[in-house]
Amino acid sequence: MDCPNMPLHINRRQMLLSAATAAGALALGPARDAFGQARVQITEGNVAPLPIAIPNFVAGTPSDNEVGGGVAQVITNNLKRSGLFAPIDQAAYVEKITNIDVPPQFKSWTSINAQALVTGRMTRQSDGRLKAEFRLWDVATGQQLAGQQYFTSPEYWRRIAHIISDQIYERLTGEKGYFDSRVVFIDESGPADRRVKRLALMDQDGANVRYLTRGSDLVLTPRFSPSTQEITYMEFGQGDPKVYLFNIETGQREIVGNFPGMSFAPRFSPDGQRIIMSLQQGGNSNLFVMDLRSKSTTRLTDTPAIDTSPSYSPDAARICFESDRGGKPQIYVMPASGGQAQRISFGDGSYSTPVWSPRGDYIAFTKQGGGQFAIGIMKPDGSGERILTSGFHNEGPTFAPNGRVLMFFRDPGGNAGPSLFTVDVSGRNELRVPTPGYASDPAWSPLLS
């Protein structure tokens, strides 16, 4: 079922007109041993996906059947793509859920090896709103683990499905989910020698694609603000490339400063009050930070080298960046206010496009060497380097809001164009992200507010 076009920015207050904990449900929180088998143990090694059953949500009226099926399918797809869950085919179900207020027949679900069960209901209200309810059950113990109800406009059913997915993920793993989020990326179309690039926005699963620019000018390196309401990006228009600020809610944009020379790789600070970027002056590229309120600019590096691709740590105390000051591109870390930079990458090849995890535990990067482009992670001190995926041309990693999944783009070369992929920080579960056309340079938003 397709979801109707949604406004570019809808916050939870606008969308969820009210929400309440369902009767008898436990308060949401970290998973506990008392949950029995319905628990996903997340480690850096292999994880056995948790078998989970997700029947179509019960419809309050026949006209809501399609919505109920659509919500269940989105939840199923989200959990399956995470690699931590193994949704059971509905054809194997023994019991048909018709009333979520009555406990399920748990023997019917243990017989198909389900360890967790999700039940739900979609009901149209007299005022036109849609009431969405769900329950999460531990099949082995018969314990209800979570339950919530939401009231929203019918066109936002897909977002409700993402929010419910996050609730299930958090309850069964003990970690925050990442499904109620968006990705901004560069949509590419046309032949390789006349490629048209547009700024585009979509849900993290590839749905609800919106085009934010027309494609008349080249756009690159879009990045979200912490509020998810603004995007900063680079555009090659008339003259030197400039850094722009785009408001998703209003569709308005403005130039971030009017700097001489070229500006590159803009990114927001964690509080959203500053933008850090690389400015080219006199053949060198150095890092600068601009205060968005005062428009004042502070220089952070001053070297006869190319310093670019800066990214803040989550606490805004440090930045990582790419520099060729040592001869070839490597990753450096320094205080966010400037000062002594410490090199942290020492493997063979060159390193680029570093980005700090929202959890603060890893820095992701692109590594080039031996004719291959790899996506990897390392700890902020440079230890524990791990290659997650490699190929002819992989580039541009970006972290999911919970820091457990990376998205990047892969370009096979030739006349074919790039595509988006996701991979777990353990290097498992590499999956292609569906997009209408070619796609590159993704940036993952925080969880929507």
Swiss-Prot record:
Cleavable signal peptide: 1-36
Entry keywords, A to Z: Cell cycle, Cell division, Periplasm, Signal
Principal subcellular localisation of the protein: periplasm
GO terms under biological process: cell division; protein import
Cellular location(s): Periplasm
Top-rank lineage group of the source organism: Bacteria
Keyword Cell division: yes
Name of a matching Pfam family: TolB_N
Gene3D superfamilies in the record: TolB, C-terminal domain, TolB, N-terminal domain
GO annotations of cellular component type: periplasmic space
Subunit structure: The Tol-Pal system is composed of five core proteins: the inner membrane proteins TolA, TolQ and TolR, the periplasmic protein TolB and the outer membrane protein Pal. They form a network linking the inner and outer membranes and the peptidoglycan layer.
Family indicated by similarity: Belongs to the TolB family.
PANTHER family referenced in this protein's UniProt entry, alphabetically: PROTEIN TOLB, PROTEIN TOLB HOMOLOG
Purpose: Part of the Tol-Pal system, which plays a role in outer membrane invagination during cell division and is important for maintaining outer membrane integrity.
Protein name: Tol-Pal system protein TolB
Organism field: Rhodopseudomonas palustris (strain HaA2)
Chain's gene name: tolB
